[in-house]
Amino acid sequence: MAVLPVVPGEQSFALGIYLLSFWHYCLYWMAFAFGVQSFGTFKRGAVIAKTVSVAALAIVYLRAPIDFASLAVIAAGILLNVRAAAVLGFDRTYYGHEVAGLPLRRVAVFPYSLTAHPMILGNVAAFGGTLINDAFRAQWWPLASLHVALNIGLLVMELAGTGRRRAVRIGGGVVLAGTLFAAVLAGLGTS
């Protein structure tokens, strides 16, 4: 019996990138909509899933020629995220109030002095910043656009709050199912 070597093609590479890219949004939604058994386990899973997602995006972004304007916007978004997370602390960054029952705490230090949702704005800037790079955008615009759309979805979820869990469960489920469908189509359609 002969064993044929499997050489992954560009289409299966793209499908893999898309399928690795969105799991952290699912974890956020599930925790927000249904709660968690262990906050520590949720945080670890969320960090691992987001790390895989960002690594997948970085792999394809770094294959494109350097675009300094794009890199500047990405860096600004990441710096906004880092500053916001540092101000909130690790537990509150991962829905500590909503999921783990940490007491409500109003934060008025930059960047929260300017906006209530700087991490989402930082994510939108960073993911949107990739689209400034023409070469990246030509092939991977659905990937970055889905990230931007899902971050806006997270904002809607956060604004709805835990008091509207049924709406969050239904709406989030529909959005995530649509995202999975769109990711598979985009991954299969990439040549």
Tell me what each language-model feature is.
Residues 1-112, 121-191:
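Membrane-anchoring alpha-helices and their flanking helix-loop junctions
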